[in-house]
């Protein structure tokens, strides 16, 4: 099947915007140019709309198996499609954990059955994510693992992490790390700062994250592995990663939209929709994250989409689980609050959500060029509306951004040339 996207606005490598047609055929982008005509193609009229590579999110929680009340592979990937994401990477903190070839094979089969977009499954570093014994990396890679992580918890043993890094390096695979030193968590629910002091709640100090990253970058240097830091959140962590990159260590990092947009001073009362891990940090941390993204210390943006039920989030700040959803709101939030205000350019935002995560992990996605996979997102930069969780495709409604008015909403998403989501009025 052929699909012809007509008159869309494309961001060039130079950062300018120009009108182009894009022809998709047999799963790839077959032509980009002006006045393309194909008599047997399905036509999507994109006049006045932005056409980008399909967005790539390398940090999501799809909850299946074991957490289907929160999300499933089907609902999570529908949320991804609605948010413009054509590729997502699924974290392994499910029950059971994908820590064996058998479980990974089941997971990839389930993805093939019910996934709406491309899903790259992470495998666990340690059995059941308990930090006691390594999984069989070679067998997991053969079964379809994308990379290795114990996300949700940090690998506490330096010896265990070094062994994991050496095994991953042999396979030319990445170690992806949730960075927390357990002895410093202090049973905290929020950042140790303004909010925790005001409300008398135990806080998680910044050093809990940064000391773990500092340890790991030195281990990564010794092992010669690609080491990736999940959801970086503190100014000290940014400094550690910046110094490591300058030293030539193969370290990369991601940041979430919520850590770019909010700090602990923005939390209104004890609302658990503002509870995530890592927590919202201080104002200086938020500023350092923006600076780190702009100077290349931080490589790309990832949502850390983490759905929970309303009942769980209704338990209050101290008892509710950590996490918020993000797939359906990431682009409009970032476009409205950073591109429209001049902090980021449109090209920077698109790159951080497409080519940069893809290139960081040597993926073929995130490109709008002839011969690339036909993964395309169409966005109406003028469309403006308030975020309404009731309309989410995700099962999760747990967002701190409900009611925020944003511009820049995806209107069509194509994966491998197939239209997987659209607002009906965009197609003809």
UniProtKB/Swiss-Prot annotation:
Q: In which pathway does it act?
A: Pyrimidine metabolism; UMP biosynthesis via de novo pathway; (S)-dihydroorotate from bicarbonate: step 3/3
User: What GO cellular-component annotations does this UniProt entry give?
Assistant: cytoplasm
Listed binding positions for Zn(2+) 2 are 151, 178, 231
- Output the CDD domains linked to this UniProt entry: DHOase_IIa (cd01317)
Q: Which reaction does it catalyse?
A: (S)-dihydroorotate + H2O = N-carbamoyl-L-aspartate + H(+)
Cited SUPFAM superfamilies: Composite domain of metallo-dependent hydrolases, Metallo-dependent hydrolases
Instruction: Name the source organism.
Output: Halalkalibacterium halodurans (strain ATCC BAA-125 / DSM 18197 / FERM 7344 / JCM 9153 / C-125)
Q: What is this protein called?
A: Dihydroorotase
């Amino acid at each position: 099947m052929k699909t012809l996207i007509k008159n869309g606005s494309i961001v060039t490598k130079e950062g300018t915007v120009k009108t182009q047609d894009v022809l998709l055929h047999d799963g790839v982008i077959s032509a980009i140019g002006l006045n393309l005509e194909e008599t047997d193609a399905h036509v999507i009229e994109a006049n006045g709309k932005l056409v980008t590579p399909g967005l790539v999110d390398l940090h999501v929680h799809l909850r299946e198996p074991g957490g289907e009340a929160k999300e499933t592979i089907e609902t999570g990937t529908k949320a991804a499609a609605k948010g413009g994401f054509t590729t997502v990477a699924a974290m392994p903190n499910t029950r059971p954990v994908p820590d064996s070839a058998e479980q990974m094979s089941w997971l990839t089969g389930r993805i093939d059955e019910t996934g709406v977009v491309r899903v790259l499954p992470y495998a666990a570093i340690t059995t059941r994510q308990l930090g006691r014994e390594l999984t069989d990396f070679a067998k997991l890679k053969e079964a379809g693992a994308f990379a290795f992580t114990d996300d949700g918890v940090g690998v506490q043993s330096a010896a265990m992490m070094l062994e994991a890094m050496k095994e991953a390096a042999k396979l030319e695979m990445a170690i992806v790390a949730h960075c927390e030193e357990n002895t410093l968590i202090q049973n905290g629910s929020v950042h140790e700062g303004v909010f925790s002091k005001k409300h008398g709640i135990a806080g998680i100090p910044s050093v809990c994250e940064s000391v773990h990253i500092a340890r790991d970058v030195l281990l990564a240097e010794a092992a010669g592995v690609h080491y990736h830091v999940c959801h970086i959140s503190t100014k000290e962590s940014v400094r550690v990663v910046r110094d490591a990159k300058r030293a030539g260590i193969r370290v990369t990092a991601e940041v979430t939209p919520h850590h770019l947009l909010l700090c602990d001073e923005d939390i209104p009362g004890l609302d658990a929709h503002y509870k995530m891990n890592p927590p919202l940090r201080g104002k200086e941390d938020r500023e350092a994250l923006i600076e780190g993204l702009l100077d290349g210390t931080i490589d790309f943006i990832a949502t850390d989409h983490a759905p929970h039920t309303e009942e769980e989030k209704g338990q209050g700040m101290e008892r509710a689980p950590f996490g918020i959803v993000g797939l359906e709101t990431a682009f409009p939030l970032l476009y409205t609050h950073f591109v429209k205000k001049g902090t980021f350019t449109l090209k920077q935002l698109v790159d951080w959500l497409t080519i940069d995560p893809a290139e960081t992990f040597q993926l073929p996605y995130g490109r709008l060029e002839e011969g690339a996979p036909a993964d395309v997102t169409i966005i109406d930069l003028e469309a403006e509306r308030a975020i309404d969780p009731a309309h989410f495709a995700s099962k999760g409604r747990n967002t701190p951004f409900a009611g925020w008015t944003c511009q820049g909403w995806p209107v069509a998403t194509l994966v491998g040339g197939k239209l997987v989501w659209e607002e009906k009025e965009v197609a003809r």
